[in-house]
Swiss-Prot record:
It is found in: Plastid, Chloroplast. Associates with the EF-Tu.GDP complex and induces the exchange of GDP to GTP. It remains bound to the aminoacyl-tRNA.EF-Tu.GTP complex up to the GTP hydrolysis stage on the ribosome. SUPFAM superfamilies: Elongation factor Ts (EF-Ts), dimerisation domain, UBA-like. This is Elongation factor Ts, chloroplastic.
Length: 208
């Protein structure tokens, strides 16, 4: 009995608040995760993120017919973005939490000049093949055995291409998690599918 009391006492209101700010999930879920891990916020955060991944996988194919279009114009008025983010219900789309998510993603897009695609799977095969062909000509790989060479090429290409994908970028407000992790957290919170559908990034003079 005393052991249970000791474990529960470590779950302070401050810890619950910190975890809720990081994840956006309910107070109840935060408290349960913290109690399970004896007040260890890092482990509790990891569990909530894993739960979000499982829920995201479960809801991945559910139709998202609602959502928002958000925009962000940088303070110098020389850069901006538009993004469409979809969800399943009108109530989620009209919530303050969802509006904040959309605005945050719009800011993220402006902060990441290399991105061209939402996710890795959106990159056309011809683009992937082009990078593979270029990388295979690297001088430092010419004397490598074929198996090692192919493995190195795949690793380098994966790293380069993921720099072009919005979901793979480090969150501008917390670089310990990616944009994909953030979306999964919100899926866990709303208990419905959320998808970044498309985006556009604008910079003055970029087409000149």
């Amino acid at each position: 009995m005393s052991n249970k009391s000791s474990k529960t006492s470590k779950v302070s209101i401050d810890l619950i608040k910190q975890l809720r700010e990081k994840t956006g999930v309910s107070i109840k879920d935060c408290k349960e995760a913290l109690r399970k891990h004896d007040g260890d916020i890092a482990k509790a955060l990891r569990e909530i993120q894993e739960q979000g991944s499982a829920i995201a996988q479960e809801k991945h194919n559910r139709i998202t017919v609602h959502g928002r279009i958000a925009s962000y114009i940088h303070i110098n008025n020389r850069m901006g973005s538009l993004v469409e983010i979809n969800c399943e219900t009108d109530s989620a789309a009209n919530s303050e939490e969802f509006a904040k998510l959309c605005q945050h993603i719009a800011m993220q897009i402006v902060a990441c000049p290399e991105i061209k695609y939402v996710k890795f799977e959106d990159i056309p095969e011809e683009i992937k093949n082009h990078y593979i062909e270029v990388e295979s000509q690297s001088k430092d790989l010419q004397d490598k055995p074929a198996q090692s060479k192919n493995k190195i090429i795949r690793g380098r290409i994966d790293k380069k291409l993921r720099r072009m994908c919005l979901l793979d970028q480090a969150n501008i407000k917390d670089d310990k998690v990616t944009v994909n992790d953030l979306i999964k957290e919100k899926i866990n919170k709303f208990k419905e599918n959320i998808q970044i559908n498309r985006f556009a990034r604008f910079t003055i003079g970029e087409k000149i």
